[in-house]
Amino acid sequence: MNRLPFLGLLFALLCLVTCRQMNEAHLLHLAEKQVNMNVDSVYALLVQIERPSQLSDEERLLYGWLNAYVHYKRHNSMAEDSLILPASDYYVFRNDTAKNLFSYQLKAWYWYWLKEHERCIAAIDSGVALAKALQDTGRMADMLIDKAYWYVYVWKDYEKAIETFRTAIALDARAGSFFSMGIAMGLNKNDSASYYMERSIELAVEAGDTSKIVHYLRNYAQMQAYSFDEPSGAIAVSYTHLRAHETRSN
């Protein structure tokens, strides 16, 4: 009879642990549903998971994948996101096309943060090949933009960067791609840089994205002043686009 209180306490503790595990698994799957919607929501849900080691093997892989996703989206270091490697293999096994495809980007950036640049490019090239096979032009453009970024800032190979950005723009002509192409061309002293910078600003104005407009104008002005020694031209362009933005806003 004396063992009954002990057994009752043990049962209560088991229930508490089980409930906690169920709650944390629930948080994990809620976070998964926010992917490609709101990265801040994914992060807010993940930080509530206090004991990821208590998750099942499958759930731990998802937890690692989601953390890598958050770090990628927030441009944070991914040097500790080693779980992305087994997670990627798992999603290949599960035939989860969406996660598998995105995993190539996450793996590539993981290798980038570890300064394993050859592995970084190999991962992104594999991802581009899969995206092409799946006819996912948006994801393919994303990966090519990443690859071009590394050509600019890791290898300083501006010609390859320009070629890669051009392919990405042909797939998906977004403001950020034109802006990055303009930067690469400016660094390469290419006169066509102005066209791409101005086109990026035009697209940002059309979208009404004030933060991008300011960012692009500031960088364009710096490029004109320091790379092409044309500060007056940069000022004129800045004024024209700011007036266009004000007109659209009113």
Regions found by a protein language model. Give the residues of each.
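Bacterial N-terminal signal peptides
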Residues: G8-C15
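N-terminal leader/linker segments that initiate helical-solenoid repeat arrays
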Residues: C19-Y69, K73, M78-D81, A98
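Tandem amphipathic alpha-helical repeat scaffolds
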Residues: L27-N36, G64-H75, F102-K115, R139-V154, ...
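Helix-turn-helix repeat elements of alpha-solenoid scaffolds
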Residues: Q34-V47, R74-P86, E116-D125, W155-T164, ...
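Residue position in alpha-helical solenoids
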Residues: L45, P52, Y90-F93, L130-A133, ...
